[in-house]
Amino acid sequence: MSEIAIRTVRPEAALTEEAIGRLVDAFYAKVRVDPALGPVFNSAIADWGPHLDTMRKFWSSVMLTSGRYKGNPVAAHQRVPGIQMDLFPRWLALFDQTCRELFSADIAEAFNVKANRIAESLQFALFYRPDRPWPPSAA
């Protein structure tokens, strides 16, 4: 994997739009080269610029309650070919790693609590079927 330049946010610094932008850029740089996630994301996203902008707005809305994101995450992920439930732990692990590289422990934990809740909601929306055991590993 290529070296990813990361400017760390000072632990005493407040969470800002700029810091969220650095997180999004650093995280998706890792996703794009990840052996499991890269093929799925790279085939689904033709132009990374708009996607990164959308993700900055999304995380700004989640963490700063800015209201900048105006999309539907479930609908967006329903259109992604190759998305599988077993990719979520890898996504969460990379996200956690990136948050801990950039932020104080408290801010990283706040991001990760939100990310885990979002992942759980997405998994439920994308993969739950009333006629099957949930979670699927309960079969």
For the regions a protein language model found, what residue spans apply to each?
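Core of compact, soluble alpha-helical bundle domains
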Residues: 1-139
